[in-house]
Amino acid sequence: MVAVVQADYSRAEALAAWTRLSDEFIGNCYVSVRPRHAPAWEVVVASAAGSLRLEAFKRAHDHDFLDRLAVAIGNWEQKAQRPDHEIAQMLDQVGDYGLMQGMTNPDKGFMHADILLPLLQARDACAIVVRTEPVFQQLGTAFLVRPDLILTAAHVVMDVDAATGRWASTLKNGLAFHFREKPNQREHPTLAIRPAAVALISHALPHGRPPNLLERSLAAPADTCLDYALIRLAQRVSHLRPVEVVDTAAVKQGKPCWAFGFPGGNALMMDVDLVTDIDPGSGRWLHRANVAAGMSGGCCINHEGQVAGLHEGTLDSEDDAKVKRNRGISIAAIRRDQCRDGKDPLKQVASSPSLEFRDPALVDGWYRAGTALAGEAGAAQWRASVEAALRGRNPDATDSLPAYHPWFARADVEKWIDSAAPDERLSLIHGPPGVGKSFCIHLLRGKLDPYADLVVFNPTQTNDMTWSDATGHAAAANASDYRTAAASVRYRAIDDFLGELRDRSAGGTRTCYVAIDFGPAGRQDRFVGTNWVELIAILAAAGWIRVMLIGLDDYERSVMIDRMESRPETDSVKIAESELAPITAAEFRTYAKHLASARGKPAPKQAEMAKYVDSAVVGVAEPMKMVAAVRAAIELEAALS
């Protein structure tokens, strides 16, 4: 290593020289200095960028090193015992979709690493827009701006008045939006979600004539021809993160602009090039990023990593027909148009239901929970019923499990997450075995950003660790089966933990959630008489932290409530209690109708619905009712698909 550093290279060349070292040599160096609880790789990339790294990336690119580096990092992290699913996510982020290449392309400008994450998020938020009737047709691209709202170009989705041949203010029939089934997925988008019954929330008709004959002038009346459509989905997309919409985001002439979309196929394309012209009056700009038919309606990201607008179309240059220019529509102009009547559609309460999670690991957890609840006597029968619901696939083989898992509404819990009063900072979740208490953590994950907004303590940590060890373990976001013997509590650990939470919540300016799952009834001394009580009170006293406690029994809850009411710093904190019960037959019927609507299918007929309800609710003994309802929903979703 010394010889490499002393060689006559520039700073970037010195780092590029590492590309000639063996993987084993670099790996030993890497592992030797890697912290035991290294932060998430995405956080490192977003926070540790600088000019030296960018120069090194360029040199590494010259040596075709980037793909080899991705594989090498995966090998090193595997040796360091990082979970396989995290390694797969890392490889997706550094080795696919051209993101790293766009980051290092010297001809089109460097992407600062601080905007790598916004680009990854924009990639995941994009959907293919298709029409399924009268014949299947791919129309363009759209992107999530809220879990239940999607933004696209109006000319992609708006119908044409047959009498006049002009654009109509109605959506085309048979629309569907194809999303990824999970973040950072290599596979092409396959999850089709339909528009809601009342779908068109706001829009402005296109600037030009159908099908998309754009007027050549950059300038256009901004109040009537912005060519956008904001559409409500039949269900919320809970497994993907929407892009963050900043009303003032804008492009800058001479700075790079990234364009995303699906060019006539199901593979996402991303390219970057410079902005050449801007016309604020029309809410449009021109850029040179390489785009193609099918990318209309996709999002455009500016040089600061913000959504600057959407891609409208391609124009020939007025002075040279061989020179292509691409036109974008400003998000600032779109947002002004959306809010012109004083109402902001992005801030209105979502009316679309959350219907599903997309996570095979969650399905595996459900199957294993059912096995535990069934006990030794009922395990074989439970396995057979799950295998039948999976249409003969082996439920013990995790690679054969579906991604779909139902999201059954928990109104009180979701209301606390979405709209609790400022002083309602403690939620107590309880109920009999098998009603899905621990599943409420997945509701939190589905609504929040786990990296910034949520810290979870699992039953292993609450039952087998001192709270000081558990806080450090949870803050490191490490989900391994770590165990520790009982040890004396270090009170200073709470200061470290609060500091970690404050960092996650932007200095306490955004709400941070802490979910503590005490699991099934455990030792009598697991909670009462321990420092968990004091820790929870300290967290709830912080005005920017909300705490969800899961699985405490009646006596444990009374102890917690007495502690909160006995101190001046916590006596004003309101406590929300939710006693969960299994899903009812009426709730399952409502869920089934919503799911069918989201899949673009008619609701099951009465006899067919009765079959699913019987499987989910009728004749199912406690404590198997909730896991049986999930099984029935999985069977229903497979039939609808």
From Swiss-Prot:
Keywords: Antiviral defense, Cell inner membrane, Cell membrane, Hydrolase, Membrane, Protease, Serine protease, Transmembrane, Transmembrane helix. The keyword Ion transport does not apply. It is a single-pass membrane protein. It is an enzyme of class 3 (hydrolase). The chain crosses the membrane at residues 532-552. Disulfide bonds: none annotated. It is found in: Cell inner membrane. InterPro entries: P-loop_NTPase (IPR027417), Peptidase_S1_PA (IPR009003), Peptidase_S1_PA_chymotrypsin (IPR043504). Its EC number is 3.4.21.-. GO terms for cellular component: plasma membrane. Its main location: membrane. One of its GO terms (molecular function) is serine-type peptidase activity. GO terms for biological process: defense response to virus; proteolysis. Belongs to the peptidase S1 family. Possibly a dedicated protease for substrate gasdermin bGSDM; cleaves the bGSDM precursor, releasing the pore-forming moiety, which integrates into the membrane and triggers cell death. Involved in defense against bacteriophages. When this probable 4 gene operon (bGSDM-FE772_23060-FE772_23065-FE772_23070) is inserted into E.coli it provides nearly 100-fold protection against phages T5 and T6 and about 8-fold against phage T4. The operon without bGSDM no longer protects against phage. This is Probable serine protease FE772_23065. It comes from Lysobacter enzymogenes. The lineage of its organism: Bacteria, Pseudomonadati, Pseudomonadota, Gammaproteobacteria, Lysobacterales.
